[in-house]
């Protein structure tokens, strides 16, 4: 073989071995205009006030705290400083855009030194791509390292997923997760209390290979609502072990830990601007219930939340007969706002109801702080490729010398 051809082949082998693989993403095609509640797994790139983090995602600061089971009745929550490296779940509406499920409500004001690539990878943690940003803003033919003028407002579409709000026939909220260095399918499954098999099935993965930058979705067991379609919070779903704030911050809804029944009560910050939360023809307030033992079982009368319409909180009074009277309602544990990045959001139990754990109402001290879960140590990846690349480069060096 002529030396020039050999040299070209060796150079090609070296480039293939050391070039980073293109990240894989799970995309959900869609045709419906209806958005669904979704979650994004996001790690803070810098120390940020909660208000600054919320502005990045056009989200309600209290909704972010609630989605992470962080006490949202603390004083001045928006001014709380969250540390860099803190992993959080960010609740977002997942819409249908150009036939793909994406978050379309995010706006970002560029700062000096920003590029399309830095906004996508650093600011938004790989939840979007430079191409998506350039396409959404009509910046045709722009390269990823193209500078963005400071002060420019960018539309930033983000990955998300709905998949009908179910997983294996059970209610679910989907969390979009960007794999980090050393992540494995098994480790991600363990962290979110699911199985590697389910993750592979949901993400249509033929093998359990996961590389840094890959985007997958994780189904989380959830409590769903059945509000009428004309309500502002139609389709509300809350991941197990967490909370949601709705009805203009007047109502808080929780899911778990003992079952997957949505439970809503007046929010800790509800004030005189909130509409009445009393059930009609009753003295019962939202979240109240009464028990009456009968010869046929336990008659449970409850005042439940029915959605939010034009500033009015809808309530429903229902009576149901159950074999046994339920005990006091248990709430998912709440934790204080974190001051360290060594933090894991509370993970609720599996879809199968478990014995209730001690919980607290928002605004009260938590009874316990959940233990952080950790996956296996980072697995070495692309070792063979690295060795081949080094070998090929050495051969090229010898030929050039």
Curated annotation (Swiss-Prot):
Miscellaneous information on this protein = Plants silencing LYP4 exhibit significant compromised defense responses and enhanced susceptibility toward the bacterial pathogen Xanthomonas oryzae and the fungal pathogen Magnaporthe oryzae.
According to the record, the signal peptide region is 1-23
Classify the source by domain of life.
Eukaryota
Q: Which residues form the propeptide?
A: 374-401
Q: How does it sit in the membrane?
A: Lipid-anchor; GPI-anchor
Protein's job: Functions in innate immunity. Functions as a pattern recognition receptor (PRR), sensing bacterial peptidoglycan (PGN) and fungal chitin at the cell surface. Involved in resistance against the bacterial pathogen Xanthomonas oryzae pv. oryzae (Xoo) and the fungal pathogen Magnaporthe oryzae. Binds PGN and fungal chitin in vitro. Involved in microbe-associated molecular patterns (MAMPs) perception and participates in the activation of defense genes against the bacterial pathogen Xanthomonas oryzae pv. oryzicola (Xoc) or the fungal pathogen Magnaporthe oryzae.
* Induction statement: Induced by infection with the bacterial pathogen Xanthomonas oryzae pv. oryzae.
- Residues carrying the lipid (GPI-anchor amidated serine) are 373
**Protein name per UniProt:** LysM domain-containing GPI-anchored protein LYP4
Concerning Gene3D superfamilies, the annotation shows: LysM domain
Q: In which tissues is it expressed?
A: Expressed in roots and leaves.
- Where the record annotates domain LysM, the positions are 106-156, 175-218
Kindly list the biological process annotations in GO that this record carries: innate immune response
Query: Its GO CC terms?
Result: plasma membrane; side of membrane
Residue positions with a glycan: 240, 281, 288, 310
Q: Disulphide bridges in this chain?
A: 30-96, 36-162, 94-160, 96-162, 223-255, 250-279
Subunit and partners: Interacts with LYP6. Interacts with CEBIP. Interacts with CERK1.
Q: Where in the cell is it found?
A: Cell membrane
């Amino acid at each position: 073989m002529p030396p020039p051809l050999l040299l070209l082949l060796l150079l090609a082998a070296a480039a293939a071995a050391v070039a980073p693989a293109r990240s894989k993403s799970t995309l959900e095609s869609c045709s419906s205009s209806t958005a669904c509640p979704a979650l994004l797994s996001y790690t803070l790139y810098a120390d940020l006030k909660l208000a600054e983090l919320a502005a990045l995602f056009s989200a309600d600061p209290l909704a972010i705290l609630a989605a992470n089971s962080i006490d949202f009745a603390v004083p001045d929550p928006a001014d709380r400083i969250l540390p860099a490296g803190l992993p959080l779940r960010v609740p977002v509406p997942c819409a249908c855009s150009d036939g793909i499920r994406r978050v379309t409500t995010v706006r970002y004001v560029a700062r000096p030194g920003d590029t399309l690539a830095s906004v996508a990878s650093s600011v938004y943690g790989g939840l979007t791509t430079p191409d998506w940003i350039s396409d959404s803003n009509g910046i045709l033919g722009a390269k990823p390292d193209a500078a963005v003028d400071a002060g420019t407002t960018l539309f930033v579409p983000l990955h998300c997923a709905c998949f009908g709000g179910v997983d294996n026939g059970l209610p679910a909220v989907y969390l979009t997760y960007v794999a980090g260095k050393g992540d494995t399918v098994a480790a991600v499954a363990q962290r979110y209390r699911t199985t590697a098999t389910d993750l592979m099935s949901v993400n249509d993965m033929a093998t359990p290979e996961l590389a840094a930058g890959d985007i997958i979705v994780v189904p989380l067991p959830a409590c769903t609502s059945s509000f009428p379609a004309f309500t502002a919070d139609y389709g509300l779903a809350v991941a197990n072990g967490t909370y949601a704030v709705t009805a203009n911050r007047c109502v808080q809804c929780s899911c778990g830990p003992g079952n997957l029944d949505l439970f809503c009560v007046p929010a800790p910050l509800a004030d005189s601007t909130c509409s009445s939360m009393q059930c009609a023809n009753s003295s019962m307030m939202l979240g109240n219930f009464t028990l009456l033992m009968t010869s046929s079982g336990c008659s449970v009368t409850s005042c439940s939340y029915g959605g939010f319409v034009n500033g009015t909180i809808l309530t429903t009074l229902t009576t149901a007969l159950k074999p046994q009277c339920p005990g006091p309602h248990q709430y998912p544990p709440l934790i204080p706002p974190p001051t360290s990045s060594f933090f894991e959001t509370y993970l609720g139990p599996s879809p199968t109801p478990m014995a209730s754990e001690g919980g607290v109402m928002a605004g009260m001290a938590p009874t316990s702080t959940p233990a952080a879960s950790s996956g296996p140590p980072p697995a070495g990846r692309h070792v063979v490729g690295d060795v081949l690349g080094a070998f090929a480069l050495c051969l090229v060096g010898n030929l050039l010398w």
